[in-house]
């Protein structure tokens, strides 16, 4: 069902905070490592954004698509997904220590972490805290990653914790080069994210 995977994507999109730096990286590709480090440091300073876009999800037995709204304010998030014709609407809000998932016509669910909520509701174990980094074009910190740089010293692809992420295009907003279209491939799950509107902000701590 689309709703099942809509909830899955919402939970994948959760975060463990925007601070942190220094993932263990293996670099390859055509980019310049020094330029990559400067690009990475700039993007790591982003601790606020608003994203509007579309998400497509494909699994072995079903698939679906919907719209995405993601508001990030340091460690607080408000993520909303809506399926075609309003079906499968879900909203996830919270910060480290408390997560609330509201699903249209189904109910309200709470957990201490996005990982716990995902396992409780769907029985799946996924690196749900990584997408806050991946959506900015960064590897998640404190986890080994294999990175391929493009000619502009930005990520062309990354492999991390059993997931492969492809960066198909970037867009420049407020001096930041940010992913515009990306594909995520995990075990039995493929996700395509197209960002229509990026509003990055550096809020400070």
UniProtKB/Swiss-Prot annotation:
Lipidation (N-palmitoyl cysteine): 18
One Pfam assignment: LolB
Lipid attachment residues per UniProt (S-diacylglycerol cysteine): 18
Gene name per UniProt: lolB
Signal peptide segment: 1-17
GO CC annotations on file: cell outer membrane
UniProt keyword annotations, A-Z: Cell outer membrane, Chaperone, Lipoprotein, Membrane, Palmitate, Protein transport, Signal, Transport
This protein's name: Outer-membrane lipoprotein LolB
Lineage, broadest ranks: Bacteria, Pseudomonadati, Pseudomonadota, Gammaproteobacteria, Pseudomonadales
Chief location of this protein within or outside the cell: membrane
BP GO annotations: lipoprotein localization to outer membrane; protein transport
């Amino acid at each position: 069902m689309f709703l099942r995977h809509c909830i899955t994507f919402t939970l994948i999109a959760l975060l463990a905070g925007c601070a942190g730096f220094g993932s263990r990286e293996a670099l390859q590709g055509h980019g310049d490592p020094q330029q990559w480090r400067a690009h990475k440091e700039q993007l790591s300073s982003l601790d606020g954004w608003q994203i509007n876009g579309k998400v497509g999800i494909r699994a072995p037995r079903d698939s679906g698509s919907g719209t995405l709204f993601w508001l990030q304010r340091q460690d607080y998030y408000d993520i909303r997904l809506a399926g075609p014709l309003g079906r499968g609407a879900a909203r996830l809000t919270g910060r480290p220590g408390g997560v609330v998932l509201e699903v249209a016509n189904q109910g309200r669910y709470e957990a201490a972490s996005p990982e716990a909520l995902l396992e409780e509701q769907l029985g799946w174990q996924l690196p749900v805290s990584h997408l806050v980094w991946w959506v900015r074009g960064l590897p998640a910190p404190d986890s080994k990653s294999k990175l391929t740089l493009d000619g502009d010293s930005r990520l062309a692809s990354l492999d991390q914790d059993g997931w492969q992420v492809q960066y198909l295009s970037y867009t420049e907003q407020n001096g930041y080069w940010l992913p515009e279209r990306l594909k995520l491939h995990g075990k039995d799950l493929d996700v395509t994210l197209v960002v229509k509107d990026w509003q990055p902000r550096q809020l400070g701590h």
